[in-house]
Amino acid sequence: GSGKTTLIESFLKEIQSDVVVAQINPPQVSAIDFLQAILVQFGFSPFKMKKGEIIATLNNFLIEQYAAGRKVLLIVDEAQNLSQRVLEEIRMLSGVETTKEKVLRIILAGQPELNVKLDAPELVQLTQRVRLRFHLTALSRAETRGYIEHRLEVAGAADRQIFTEDTFPLIFRFTGGVPRLVNTLCDTA
């Protein structure tokens, strides 16, 4: 509802051509399913591989991409749904490196519960590798109006008065500035 998936989609449109991306939106999956999903995103068919083969293939792929001058990015949306075992696999992947640098960048996007999971003592090693945490907040009253006006413009309705002046504060009041709720309310209006 806060716009994190939309933000990821916008980010992916702007990404440089030398970046190889795997985007995962897992339901609750096992560690091996998660690793297989990553390899599938990179063009492999890992379904008959054992876990050791999957990890070796993934590590080799990461090193090959680095040697070819490409960066590798793993984006995991709805990461709050990941089990502790999967988060531990992510920690292990984040440690793959050459003598110069780490070869995998990882973005974990999720609901606020993700922060609670990452703060668990069992995941201290993963948390120590987190370079940045960012929290999307709800829109302000002015941002909500700007957001609605922008969406109307994109929809081709910029010249039409869809909402009266006194409607914008009401939309903000009933939605709290949460983009998904703003969209839902405006779509049903």
Predicted regions span which residues?
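P-loop NTPase Walker A phosphate-binding motif
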Residues: G1-V19, Q28
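Switch/connector loops and helix/strand junctions flanking conserved nucleotide-binding motifs
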Residues: T5, A31-D33, Q84, L114-L118, ...
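Helix-loop-helix "sensor" segment of P-loop NTPases
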Residues: F44, E64-A67, L73, T98, ...
